[in-house]
């Protein structure tokens, strides 16, 4: 019998713990980047600059672009997995958020703001964890794939 790569495997206890951990981290990333995205995308630069001085020193378009990317990542890290429609987007969104944080490290260090580096590393690591977990270890099966397995009698 030929098996599909997407065929469900037996769920182990460690997989359940990992799935739970991934959902918690996904929620943390969604809240954090959702808030950051709204601030960077919608709050006037003059009001944002006292709390995020870098926003006054770069193009407003860049601040808005970063905000839009953070918002897209916040939605993408949870919604596709939650509704199981194109869940492959979840690890991609997590990787994108990790990339934003990774690029922010040298930017802030070059501005003499190394104190934010630990936080940036933590959020980059959380993004990498979700990208790894949802793409390699315990990916979420899309509704379409699950329906196909049911029709084929493999579930």
Model-predicted segments: where are they?
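Membrane-interface extramembranous regions
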Residues: 2-155
């Amino acid at each position: 019998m030929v098996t599909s790569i997407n065929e469900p495997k037996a769920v182990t206890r460690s997989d359940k713990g990992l799935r739970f951990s991934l959902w918690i981290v996904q929620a943390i990333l969604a809240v954090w980047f959702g808030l950051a995205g709204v601030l960077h995308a919608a709050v006037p630069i003059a009001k944002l600059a006292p709390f995020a001085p870098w926003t006054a020193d770069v193009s407003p378009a860049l601040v808005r672009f970063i905000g839009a990317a953070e918002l897209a990542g916040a939605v993408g890290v949870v919604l596709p997995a939650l509704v199981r429609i194109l869940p492959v987007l979840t690890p991609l969104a997590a990787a994108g958020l990790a990339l934003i944080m990774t690029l922010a490290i040298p930017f802030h260090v070059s501005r003499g703001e190394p104190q934010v580096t630990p936080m940036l590393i933590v959020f980059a690591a959380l993004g990498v964890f979700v990208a790894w977990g949802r793409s390699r270890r315990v990916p979420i099966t899309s509704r379409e794939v699950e329906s196909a397995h049911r029709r084929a009698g493999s579930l």
